[in-house]
Amino acid sequence: MATAGHKGAPKTKVRRKEKKNVVAGQAHIKSTFNNTIIAITDPSGAVISWASAGTVGFKGSRKSTPFAAQMAAEAAGRRAMEHGMKRVDVFVKGPGSGRETAIRSLGAVGLEIGPISDVTPVPHNGCRPPKRRRV
């Protein structure tokens, strides 16, 4: 009876992230009541770096804090600067508490902040909003 030979793990190529040389781009900040997500893109919209309050180590209700948004923006900004990013136009979406802090911390990381636009979608009286909380 022949013994089955151990086949070892299939060899996979490790793709190293290539350094994109993008000087100017866009920072899209989506700030909800539960989380803040920052995506930094090149002018055509291809994502260069991103971070959220969850990816930088916050869980549960701490993700919705301004401090979590600050840490996420710093992480995304640092990663974008590694690809040569120097200037960003900011697009803010959503009603969350991390909007202003995220913009401020993108500037603190060393990115030059261009025009800031609020692109929060406003319904023409669409869906019924969630009921009011009674505490």
Swiss-Prot record:
Record's subunit section: Part of the 30S ribosomal subunit. Interacts with proteins S7 and S18. Binds to IF-3.
UniProt superkingdom: Bacteria
Matching Pfam families: Ribosomal_S11
Family statement drawn from the similarity comment of this UniProt entry: Belongs to the universal ribosomal protein uS11 family.
Keywords on record: Ribonucleoprotein, Ribosomal protein, RNA-binding, rRNA-binding
Gene Ontology biological process terms in this record: translation
Lineage, top ranks: Bacteria, Bacillati, Actinomycetota, Actinomycetes, Propionibacteriales
Organism of origin: Cutibacterium acnes (strain DSM 16379 / KPA171202)
Protein name, per record: Small ribosomal subunit protein uS11
The UniProt record lists the keyword Acetylation: no
Gene Ontology molecular functions: rRNA binding; structural constituent of ribosome
Role: Located on the platform of the 30S subunit, it bridges several disparate RNA helices of the 16S rRNA. Forms part of the Shine-Dalgarno cleft in the 70S ribosome.
Gene Ontology annotations for the cellular component aspect, listed alphabetically: ribonucleoprotein complex; ribosome
Signal peptide: none
InterPro entries attached to this UniProt entry: Ribosomal_uS11, Ribosomal_uS11_bac-type, Ribosomal_uS11_CS, Ribosomal_uS11_sf
HAMAP family found in the cross-reference section: Ribosomal_uS11
